[in-house]
Each structure stands twice: as C-alpha cells, then as structure tokens.
A protein has these predicted regions:
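Mixed-charge, Lys/Arg-enriched low-complexity segments
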Residues: 42-80
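N-terminal acidic leader/helix
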Residues: 1-34
Length: 80
C-alpha cells in the first residue's frame, strides 16, 4: 500500500492510499475510522481523488463518525 498523500483537516486525519488497482480515502477520528475504496479507473488522476474530498464529503463523514460513536457508546452501555 502506497501513501499518496494527506489532506489536512482540524477534525480528523485524512490519508489517501493507492493499493491493488484502487485508491483508498481513509478518515480517522480517535479510535474510529472510515475507508472509501475507489477503483483507479473511476478517477483520471490523484488530483481528481483529492477533489472528491471536498467540505461536503468531509462534513458527511464527520456526521457518520458521530453516529458511529453514539452506536458504540450505546452498545458498550448494554454490556457495562
């Protein structure tokens, strides 16, 4: 797996990878992560890959992190 780059953001870590004829966009926030896989033929360049990760996409991803955190917290409360 090759690191293509990182996209700076104050609320999460965003790393771009190239691997196995795919690009991966990995978001990390604390102990949670989300990875999006995109076939390399669906974008024409790494610049296109970066263009996909706009503020709308990041905002939607951050909202999912909140939902993931709530879901995990609720499940941990069941066993705790």
């Amino acid at each position: 797996m090759r690191v293509v780059g990182e996209i700076p953001h104050p609320d999460c870590k965003i790393t771009l990878f190239a691997w196995n004829n795919r690009y991966l966009i990995k978001f990390e926030q604390g102990l949670l992560e989300q990875t999006f896989k995109i076939h390399e033929y669906d974008v024409t360049s790494e610049a296109d890959l970066r263009a996909l990760v706009d503020e709308t996409f990041i905002s939607e991803t951050l909202s999912r992190f909140e939902a993931m955190r709530n879901s995990l917290r609720n499940r941990l409360n069941v066993i705790g």
